[in-house]
A protein has these predicted regions:
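Specific transmembrane alpha-helical segments of multi-pass solute transporters/efflux pumps
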Residues: 29, 33-34, 62-114, 118, ...
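Hydrophobic transmembrane alpha-helices of multi-pass small-molecule transport proteins
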Residues: 61, 128, 137-157, 175-176, ...
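Glycine-/small-residue-enriched transmembrane alpha-helix faces in small-molecule transporters
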Residues: 2-51, 160-187, 207-209, 310
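Hydrophobic/small/kink-forming positions within alpha-helical transmembrane segments
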Residues: 28-31, 35, 62, 91-96, ...
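Juxtamembrane helix-entry segments on the extracytoplasmic side of multipass membrane proteins
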Residues: 15-20, 43-47, 51, 79-84, ...
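Alpha-helical transmembrane segments of compact multi-pass small-molecule transporters, enriched
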Residues: 33, 56-60, 117-131, 146-147, ...
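Transmembrane alpha-helical segments that form core, pore/gating elements
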Residues: 47, 61, 125-126, 131, ...
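Helix-helix packing/entry segments at the starts of transmembrane helices
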Residues: 50-52, 113-120, 184-207, 238-278
């Protein structure tokens, strides 16, 4: 795949602010996924949950595709046959392999340590963006990343402890996979409509995880997720934690630099922290407050601060 160095024309300030809001919403919705998954995994095996999430998400996105207007930039919705291999790569690499590694990494290393490793995403995305897309690293981006990542460390680092070595390796592999896919997605969505690429990628993921779901259902007795409370949360996960944020993430990647998108990633643990306190009655610590303040500062500075070349 040829990585395009140049992106679209520089966005107006008003458009940039709108995209920043979309990025904040995207990462906040992903942050709520941790709380929802914690509830669903009590009744649904992990790959069954993943497959149902993708199947429902694909259905929702297909319905939306039928009623949406054409892309304002005129990008095609029909993907050429020679480019489908990249869509399969996005689906298998970004939505199956990366998430699967994250799930098993969390299981082996522990949730706190896995979350701490996941905070490396902005750094790795910026590294690949500079290396492959030749994006410029500015002083503002460095300050934002340092502030946000250190804030995320404050939130989850206190309880990280020591984890299984394989779990740590799998968690790092998940970060590398997702970051690399995000950078390639930035290049690919310069050519095709972002929502179409997302929809097709999620269909690939749904098909790929279907055999895993069938195996889990055949080997796991007593699986019952048809209770209304599970169905409602599953629909929330499929639409609000998958279809909407994945589409917004890929759309944002098509409009602004990948390294800029990565600055909003630490909003995830901040959202997870707030929901954990409000819904799961988790204890609020000084580290939580410090981390939250640093993340908010990083996000605000990324949207309001002036650029300086590093």
């Amino acid at each position: 795949m040829t990585v395009q160095r140049s992106g679209p024309p520089v966005e107006t300030q008003k458009t940039e602010k709108s995209i920043y809001l979309l990025l904040a919403l995207t990462t906040a919705l992903w942050g709520s996924l941790y709380t929802a998954n914690k509830f669903l995994l009590e009744a649904v095996p992990s790959f069954t949950l993943l497959c149902l999430r993708y199947l429902l998400s694909a259905a929702a996105m297909t319905a939306f595709q039928c009623f949406r207007k054409p892309d304002p930039q005129g990008k095609p919705r029909h993907i050429r046959g020679s480019d489908w291999k990249y869509v399969v790569l996005f689906g298998l690499g970004g939505y199956v392999l990366s998430i699967g590694l994250q799930q098993y990494g969390t299981k082996l290393a522990g949730a706190s340590l896995a979350s701490l490793i996941n905070c490396m995403n902005p750094i790795v995305i910026c590294f690949f963006a500079v290396l492959l897309l030749h994006e410029c690293m500015t002083v503002k981006k460095v300050v934002c990343i340092a502030s946000a990542v250190f804030g995320a460390v404050c939130i989850v680092g206190g309880d990280a402890g020591s984890g299984h070595l394989l779990g740590i390796v799998l968690s790092f592999a998940s970060v590398l996979t997702w970051s690399l896919i995000s950078v390639f997605m930035r290049s690919f969505t310069q050519k095709y409509d972002a929502l179409t690429v997302t929809t097709c990628g999620i269909y690939v993921a749904a098909v790929a995880t279907l055999p895993l779901m069938l195996h889990e259902l055949a080997t796991t007795p007593g699986v019952d997720f048809l209770h209304p409370k599970y169905i409602l949360v599953l629909l929330y996960v499929a639409v609000c934690c998958t279809a909407v944020p994945h589409s917004l993430w890929n759309y944002s990647l098509s409009r602004v630099e990948a390294s800029t998108c990565s600055l909003f990633y630490p909003v995830q643990p901040l959202t997870s922290m707030v929901l954990g306190v409000l819904l799961l009655h988790e204890h609020m610590t000084v580290g939580y407050l410090m981390g939250g303040a640093l993340i908010v500062f990083g996000v605000l500075y990324s949207t309001l601060g002036k650029e300086k070349q590093a």
